A protein has these predicted regions:
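Short glycine-/aliphatic-rich beta-strand segments at the starts of folded cytosolic domains
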Residues: 9-26
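C-terminal structural segments of small proteins and small subunits
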Residues: 63-86
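RNA-recognition motif
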Residues: 48-54
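Short amphipathic beta-strand starts and helix->beta connectors
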Residues: 2-7, 39-46
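A generic structural signal for beta-strand entry/edge sites
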Residues: 18, 55-57
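Short amphipathic alpha-helix segments
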Residues: 24-42
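N-terminal targeting leaders
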Residues: 19, 24, 32, 72, ...
Length: 86
């Protein structure tokens, strides 16, 4: 099951980064905890967690936010998070 969110930006040109991470978020309750934190970040446009994937993949589309910030958000919530090599 995938859980995610989508934000709408004003009409402007932005460089959107696609960031992909391995996590240990395995159930809906954990995903909802992380959802509150990711949704609170204005620079995160869209995200989803594929809990059926063996790596529990978190994909984030964002502007002006990097890998370290996303990892920090997930780790501060108490979960494992590392960038997957692309």
């Amino acid at each position: 099951m995938k859980i995610g969110s989508l934000a709408v930006l004003p009409q402007k040109s932005y460089a959107i980064n696609l960031l992909i991470f391995k996590t240990n978020i395995v159930n809906k309750k954990q995903a909802m905890k992380v959802a509150k934190l990711l949704d609170a970040e204005n620079n995160i446009l869209r995200w989803n967690i594929d809990r059926q994937d063996v790596d529990r993949v978190l994909r984030v589309e964002a502007v002006n936010i990097g890998t370290r910030e996303i990892i920090s958000i997930i780790q501060d919530a108490g979960y494992f998070c590392e960038e997957l090599a692309g």
